[in-house]
A protein has these predicted regions:
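Short, low-complexity N-terminal intrinsically disordered segments enriched in polar/charged residues
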Residues: 1-37, 126-130
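Surface-exposed, charged secondary-structure patches
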Residues: 4, 11, 46, 54-99
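Hydrophobic alpha-helical segments typical of transmembrane helices
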Residues: 15, 27-30, 59-60, 73-74, ...
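Hydrophobic pocket/interface hotspot
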Residues: 19, 31-32, 40-41, 52, ...
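Short, hydrophobic secondary-structure boundary micro-motifs
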Residues: 31-33, 43-44, 71-72, 117-118
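Short beta-strand segments enriched in hydrophobic/aromatic residues
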Residues: 35-36, 91-93, 120-123
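A short local loop/turn or secondary-structure capping micro-motif enriched for an aromatic residue
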Residues: 51, 94-97, 124-127
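Short beta-strand edge/turn micro-motifs at domain boundaries
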Residues: 86, 100-129
Length: 130
């Protein structure tokens, strides 16, 4: 199996960047196309467990568009073959002082492009500087 083929990493990076832009601008149209429209798609959030595309879409539609801007760090995209990838990133928001967010996504290439099939978002206390 080929791991981290440069052209596949670039494709997933572009999809991840598209997600980030849509997330921080609350572009529901784009967000709704990124997650796989399937009842098996799962998103575990900071305060919610969403099972299936319909629950994810409803959550996004009901969420406040205020305070979504964030800064990402240590983003790692790893691809396995040409059709499977993970994207992991840390994030911080001005609205969450002292907290560090962590996000992991599982991406799969389908005939219509790359989609998230599973995601997990969590918060921890920001580590103290040594």
């Amino acid at each position: 199996m080929d791991i981290d083929l440069p052209e596949v990493v670039a494709e997933v990076k572009a999809a991840f960047d598209r997600y980030e832009k849509a997330l921080t601008s609350n572009d529901l149209g784009v967000l709704n196309t990124i997650f796989r429209n399937d009842p098996r798609t799962i998103r575990y959030g900071i305060g919610e467990n969403l099972y299936g595309y319909d629950e994810i879409k409803a959550f996004r539609g009901a969420r406040s568009p205020v305070g979504l801007m964030r800064t990402t760090a240590r983003t790692v995209i790893t691809t396995y073959g040409r059709d499977f990838a993970t994207a992991s990133t840390l994030f911080s928001r001005a609205t969450m002082p002292g907290k560090l967010g962590r996000q992991m996504q599982t991406w799969v290439r389908f005939p219509d492009g790359w989609h998230v099939v599973a995601a997990h978002v969590s918060l921890i206390d920001e580590p103290k500087a040594a």
